[in-house]
């Protein structure tokens, strides 16, 4: 399978329509039937998909319209977790932090329904399914059952592995493990790496790993060891500085973050075009995908959309330059190719 060179994608989240946020609130208060809420989520999913497609994104997703939060969504579906109530993340932001109170078990698919709905309603051949990784789920949950963190994390890795196999069986081509917490404790990075590798054991499709702004020099020490196809990382947030760690990346792709998801200023097409060209100092264009730094959900929806539009326009400009060198397409690599 071939894709245009410098394929464009998203990381995961996208601003929810205001009417969907109202439905979330009504659901929380028990004032609407669950079927009404699910219908609203499906409608929002299609709306965001169309927005991504209209922006020109090659590999879209639905912006996680059915997910209230990136760990809560998964822990609510895994047997053995219990919720005690919300905890503060920052400012006035809260999430329901789960506690493992029994052995964790895979009872039902976690994101299969999401994937099948998106697959059915997109015009694109490939979508990217974001899944919160085992280490981050453990790090952002309480442990009231397991004797140590390793057994907690590795049981979650087994569960994610089962989910990936279900998705692959139903035609998924590209999943992305989100591990924003994996570099929090340098001494535990080997555990996070082992968990990722266990989660992808026996998987053949394309697997990306997204790690938010952090110490990428530490991550780079494990580039070869981590069994994924692609690393999706933030660069706009650091003004494209300190990129020398990319010299350690070989035979794996880079998802190059080119728009800042924390800044409402919309980067110009020319700014993004120049940023893209910087990465060619380290990697051949055939090994680069283009995406935002991270999920876009904290931005105003119009701003998020315009950032995607400008990102795609910048990519198209660089593609025209690469076309003069005979570079127009790339192979869609999977774990089998790495």
From Swiss-Prot:
GO biological process, any: methionine biosynthetic process
The organism's taxonomic lineage, starting at the top: Archaea, Methanobacteriati, Methanobacteriota, Thermococci, Thermococcales
Gene3D superfamilies: 3.20.20.210
Family: Belongs to the archaeal MetE family.
Enzyme class: transferase
EC number: 2.1.1.-
Keywords from the UniProt entry: Amino-acid biosynthesis, Metal-binding, Methionine biosynthesis, Methyltransferase, Transferase, Zinc
Pfam families for the chain: Meth_synt_2
Task of the protein: Catalyzes the transfer of a methyl group to L-homocysteine resulting in methionine formation. The physiological methyl donor is unknown.
InterPro entries per the UniProt record, alphabetical: Met_Synth_C/arc, MetE_arc, UROD/MetE-like_sf
HAMAP family in alphabetical order: MetE
NCBIfam families: PRK04326.1
Top-rank lineage group of the source organism: Archaea
Keyword NADP: no
Co-factor binding comment: Binds 1 zinc ion per subunit.
Cofactor annotation: Zn(2+)
Species for this entry: Pyrococcus furiosus (strain ATCC 43587 / DSM 3638 / JCM 8422 / Vc1)
Protein name: Methionine synthase
UniProt binding sites for Zn(2+): 210, 212, 234, 294
A single MF term (Gene Ontology): zinc ion binding
């Amino acid at each position: 399978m071939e894709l245009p060179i410098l394929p464009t994608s998203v990381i995961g989240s996208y601003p929810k329509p205001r009417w969907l946020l109202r439905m979330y609130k009504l659901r929380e208060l028990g004032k609407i039937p669950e079927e009404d809420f699910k219908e609203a989520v499906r409608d929002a999913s299609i709306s965001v998909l169309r927005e991504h497609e209209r922006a020109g994104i090659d590999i879209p997703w639905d912006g996680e319209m059915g997910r209230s939060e990136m760990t809560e969504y998964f822990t609510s579906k895994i047997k053995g977790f219990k919720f005690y109530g919300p905890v503060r993340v920052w400012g006035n932001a809260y999430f329901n932090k789960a506690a493992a109170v029994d052995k964790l078990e895979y009872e039902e698919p976690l994101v299969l329904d999401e994937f099948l709905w998106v697959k059915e309603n997109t015009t694109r051949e490939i979508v990217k399914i974001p899944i919160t990784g085992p280490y981050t789920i453990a790090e952002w949950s309480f442990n009231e059952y397991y004797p140590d963190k390793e057994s907690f994390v590795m049981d979650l890795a087994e569960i994610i592995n089962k989910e990936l196999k279900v998705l692959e069986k139903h035609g998924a081509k590209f999943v992305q493990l989100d591990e924003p917490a994996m570099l929090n404790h340098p001494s535990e990075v080997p555990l996070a790496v082992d968990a990722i590798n266990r989660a992808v054991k026996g998987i053949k499709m394309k697997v990306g790993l997204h790690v938010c702004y952090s110490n990428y020099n530490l991550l780079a020490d494990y580039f070869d060891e981590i069994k994924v196809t692609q690393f999706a990382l933030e660069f706009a947030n650091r003004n494209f500085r300190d990129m020398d760690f990319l010299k350690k990346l070989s035979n794996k792709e880079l998802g190059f973050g080119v728009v800042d998801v924390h800044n409402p200023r919309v980067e110009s097409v020319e700014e993004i075009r120049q940023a893209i060209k910087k990465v060619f100092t380290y990697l051949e264009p055939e090994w680069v995908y283009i995406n935002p730094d991270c999920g876009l959900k904290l931005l105003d929806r119009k701003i998020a959309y315009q950032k995607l539009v400008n990102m795609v326009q910048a990519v198209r400009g660089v593609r025209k330059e690469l076309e003069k060198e005979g570079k127009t397409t790339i192979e869609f690599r999977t774990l089998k190719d790495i």
